[in-house]
From Swiss-Prot:
The gene is SPG21. The modification Phosphoserine is found at residue 304. Keywords: Cytoplasm, Endosome, Golgi apparatus, Hereditary spastic paraplegia, Membrane, Neurodegeneration, Phosphoprotein. This is Maspardin. InterPro entries: AB_hydrolase_1 (IPR000073), AB_hydrolase_fold (IPR029058), Maspardin (IPR026151). Its main location: cytoplasm.
Length: 308
């Protein structure tokens, strides 16, 4: 049990990448926690947004791999926000504080929904250059919990944890998926009542994405085709919403592929970010991009333009 928590990779990550805490709101209790790794010269990094049960370190395998390839990566943990507008306003202030004009966002589950809402919120003065949506959704009504969204703040922590755990895989899983679930349960245990209640509120509060406001943003939809908390209908809705999105399909990986199928997830992230190499919105250090990769990028751009 708890293999990931005691793994050399995780311990090396915790020992080398500092966890920063930043306050951008008037309320001092609203603290953003984040890992910022890779070259600071990159002004359009990739930012990871976790699911309800996650902390910033659930993306440690992406941080280690992507920074090794020259990318700047930031993984976040949310303060306690109770509605989407408050979250979006706080996230905008955080980007201002970090002096980041535009960013790429990778959002897992709730993180993906919040990434879309932030892109929608800033559509008149865009802050989101691209989106990678992993096991995500575009309408909170799929959870049939909108009627309870206003009462999560009243519930004790053990009850909230029970609600979240109800979405974790209960059937047979392979050892890597079992380790990922153990790690996420451990992360869930580290969250306080208000953190959990606010995230569940954001996850279930009646809201949907307005696609016409973000239709020009490049999107990759990353889906897992075994047991995950998302229904097939929710996935189909995402495909309809983003008809031009790239699709990254993983045969297995459950709810947490970034932990148990990290090599595949990292490859799909690289493929997504490749389209921005050689531009001012590249998330990678230019010295790490080979001339050959730039040529491949130009070639693939030429092909996609011919197809249009």
């Amino acid at each position: 049990m708890g293999e990931i928590k005691v793994s050399p990779d995780y311990n090396w990550f915790r020992g080398t990448v500092p966890l920063k805490k930043i306050i951008v709101d008037d309320d001092d209790s609203k603290i953003w926690s984040l890992y910022d790794a890779g070259p600071r010269s990159i002004r359009c990094p990739l930012i990871f947004l976790p699911p309800v049960s996650g902390t910033a370190d659930v993306f440690f395998r992406q941080i280690l791999a992507l920074t090794g390839w020259g990318y700047r990566v930031i993984a976040l943990q949310y303060p306690v926000y109770w509605d989407h507008l408050e979250f979006c306003d706080g996230f905008r202030k955080l980007l201002d504080h970090l002096q980041l004009d535009k960013v790429h966002l990778f959002g897992a589950s709730l993180g993906g929904f919040l990434a879309q809402k932030f892109a929608e919120y800033t559509h008149k003065s865009p802050r989101v250059h691209s989106l990678i949506l992993c096991n995500s959704f575009s309408d909170t009504s799929i959870f049939n919990q909108t009627w309870t969204a206003n009462s999560f703040w009243l519930m004790p922590a053990f009850m909230l944890k029970k609600i979240v755990l109800g979405n974790f895989s209960s059937g047979p899983v392979d050892p890597m998926m079992a380790d990922a679930i153990d790690f996420m349960v451990d992360r869930l245990e580290s969250l306080g009542q208000s953190e959990l209640a606010s995230r569940l509120t954001l996850n279930c509060q009646n809201s949907y994405v307005e696609p016409h406001k973000i239709r020009d943003i490049p999107v990759t939809i990353m889906d897992v085709f075994d047991q995950s908390a998302l229904s097939t209908e929710a996935k189909e809705e995402m495909y309809k919403l983003y008809p031009n999105a790239r699709r990254a399909h993983l045969k297995t990986g459950g709810n947490f592929p970034y932990l148990c199928r990290s090599a595949e997830v990292n490859l799909y992230v690289q493929i997504h970010l490749l389209q921005f190499h050689g531009t001012k919105y590249a998330a990678i250090d230019p010295s790490m991009v080979s001339a050959e990769e730039l040529e491949v990028q130009k070639g693939s751009l030429g092909i996609s333009q011919e197809e249009q």
